[in-house]
Amino acid sequence: MAVAYEGQLTGHRGWVTSLACPQTPETATKVVSTSRDKTLLSWGPNPDRHSSECSYGLPDRRLEGHSAFVSDVALSNNGNFAVSASWDHSLRLWNLQNGQCQYKFLGHTKDVLSVAFSPDNRQIVSGGRDNALRVWNVKGECMHTLSRGAHTDWVSCVRFSPSLDAPVIVSGGWDNLVKVWDLATGRLVTDLKGHTNYVTSVTVSPDGSLCASSDKDGVARLWDLTKGEALSEMAAGAPINQICFSPNRYWMCAATEKGIRIFDLENKDIIVELAPEHQGSKKIVPECVSIAWSADGSTLYSGYTDNVIRVWGVSENA
């Protein structure tokens, strides 16, 4: 594979904590970001992006309302709605067409760390520092809390499988466990054990067959989601902040403290390592804390602790 730096998105005034891309071809150039500056930004393409590396895209809207760090964002399938999680103990559902907050979700008693949309866009799951996993409808009403077999420490990450027939929730926590839940019943399906430090991120493959998880030790683990079995583990060489699968290739991307690592999942090898070209007198290299792939797999967005989103073009062959 070949990866080339294409430019950056600047507009946040704090760490870029999360990134999400719409999953429809007509919105392939759009991305939504969250930040420690308490806002979300919705980005569109810059017609002049090829003439200036500093303006790959332009913010369409700045979504304001949270009173603390915004930690995560998830998009509806059509890309028209975003749900955000915040350290102000709340979630918010946003209409990206007009920039308005439609609903505020209250129920968590501590910082909310992660959020995800169900495949049919009718339910939302969230996890946070109150150790709770909550399932909501899109109007902000908490339908139930997944309590039996729950995490015994912070819930750091939650994701849905893409299956419409039998959707499951995957969660990771500071108790070193990855848990798989049946959405229909709210029951724990299985514990995926193996991490020796807290779980920082979970992700589910586009076909729903695989789950990957990462931890603070810099280890990514691959699981058979249907069987609940461990398949392999890969070392990134640095603590991993977030992981995501390529939408159309057998690759996995990891945002780490030392840059981006892309793994070939068949060979379990790191095939690409990316580091930002840091300019300035300070020798502090920014840390990659968030990552997202466009729906067509041709663009990789990465968020950093210097408040910048860096954009990479991805092709299969060098």
Swiss-Prot record:
It comes from Trypanosoma brucei brucei. The keyword Lyase does not apply. Belongs to the WD repeat G protein beta family. Ribosomal protein RACK1 subfamily. One of its GO terms (biological process) is regulation of cytokinesis. The lineage of its organism: Eukaryota, Discoba, Euglenozoa, Kinetoplastea, Metakinetoplastina. SUPFAM superfamilies: WD40 repeat-like. This is Small ribosomal subunit protein RACK1. The keyword Ribosomal protein applies. SMART domains: WD40 (SM00320). PROSITE patterns: WD_REPEATS_1, WD_REPEATS_2, WD_REPEATS_REGION. CDD domains: WD40. WD repeats lie at residues 11-44, 65-95, 107-137, 150-182, 194-224, 235-264, 282-315. It holds the Pfam family WD40. One of its GO terms (molecular function) is ribosome binding. Keywords: Repeat, Ribonucleoprotein, Ribosomal protein, WD repeat. GO terms for cellular component: cytoplasm; ribonucleoprotein complex; ribosome.
